Amino acid sequence: MKQILILLTFVSIFSLYSVHLLLKTANEGGSLLYEQLGHKAFGLVGKLAASGSITMQNIGAMSSYLFIVKYELPLVIKALMNIEDTNGLWYLNGDYLVLLVSLVLILPLSLLRNLGYLGYTSGLSLLCMVFFLIVVICKKFEISCPLEVASIISDLVNNTLTRPTAMAFNITDGDSCRPRYFIFNSQTVYAVPILTFSFVCHPAILPIYEELKGRSRRRMMNVSKISFFAMFLMYLLAALFGYLTFYERVESELLHTYSKVLETDILILIVRLAVLVAVTLTVPVVIFPIRGSITHLLCPAKDFSWWRHSLITVSILAFTNLLVIFVPTIRDIFGFIGASAAAMLIFILPSAFYIKLVKKEPMKSVQKIGVSKRS
C-alpha cells in the first residue's frame, strides 16, 4: 500500500508542476495552443512532437474508455434482462455495443464546436465516479474476509484438482486477510506508466484556460490544484479500500472482482451503470484536443469549416473503435501510452518549452536548472 501512496504523490506533484510550467510558457510564448508552443520553441520538430504526443495520449484514453463500454455494457444488459444464454444475441456483443454507443451518444456530443457546452456532462461523469468511490468504501465493511464464496471456489476447481490442500489453505487462511504494506515487483514498475497516464490532462489545460471566465494564470492554477487533489484523493481511496476488501484476490479490473463475489448485487449493478455513463460522457471531452491538434497541424491558417470539423471527428471515432474491437486488452495500451506519450506530455515537453521560451529567467537560474534536470 505504501508504494501506491508514494507513486501517486510523486506523479501528481510532477504533473501539477508541469501544468504550472505550461501555463507560464503559454503566457510568455503568446500562444494557447500546445502545438504552436512546440513550433515556437523547436520549429516543425517541436510541433510534430507535441501533436503526435497529444494524439497518441488521447486516442489511448478514448480506447480505455471504450474498452470499459465494450466489456461492462453487455454484463449490465445481461443482468437487467436476466439472460442466461448469450449465444447469438447481438445486443450482448461488446463490439456492436461500442459502435452503437459511439454513433448514438458520443458522436453528437463530439460534434459540438465549443468545449464549454460539455461542462455539464463532465460534472455528471465526475458525480458518477464519486458514487463509485462511495460504494467501494461501503463494500469494504460489507464483504467479510476470508472470502468464503461459492463463485470463487468454482473458479479454483481446476487448480484444486492437483493441489487441493494448498488451495483450500489459501481461501481460508487468515494471512490472506492481512495487508502487505510494501510490495515491490514487476507489477509495481508497471504501475508507473499507468499512473502517469491517469494524471495527463495537459492537452486540455490550454483549451480550458482559453475559455475560462476572468482568465488568469493564478485562477487556472487554483482550478488545477483543486482538480489534482480531488483526483489524487479518489485514486488513493479507491485503491486503498479496493485492496483492503479483497487483499491478495483483488484484480486489475475492480468491478470484475466485485462481480465474482456479489453476482446479483443491485448496488454494484448501479455502479456499473454509473461508470458507463462517466466514461461515455468523457470521450467527447477527449476528442477536442485531438481534433484541435490535427486541425492545427494540417490546416492552421484556414477558417472553421463544419465539413472538416465533422470529417476529423468521425475519422477519430472510427479509428478508435477499430482499435477497441481488434486489440484484445487495454493493459498494453495503458503501458505503452503511459511510457511514451504521457511521459512526453508531463515530464519532457512542458520543461523543454519552458527552458526555450521563457526568456526573462536566465539559464543558470534555480528554476531552469531544476527543470532541465527533471526533463
Regions found by a protein language model. Name each.
Residues 1-13, 125-127, 337-342:
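Loop-to-helix transition at the N-terminal end of transmembrane alpha-helices
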Residues 1-2, 113-114, 326-330:
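Transmembrane helix interruption/hinge and helix-loop junction motifs
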Residues 8-42, 57, 66:
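Juxtamembrane transmembrane-helix boundary signature
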Residues 11-15, 55-63, 127-128, 230-234:
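Membrane-embedded alpha-helical segments of transport systems
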Residues 14-18, 129, 342-348:
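Alpha-helical transmembrane segments and their membrane-interface exit regions
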Residues 31-51, 63-98, 122-125, 133-342, ...:
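Membrane-interfacial loop- and helix-cap regions that link adjacent transmembrane helices
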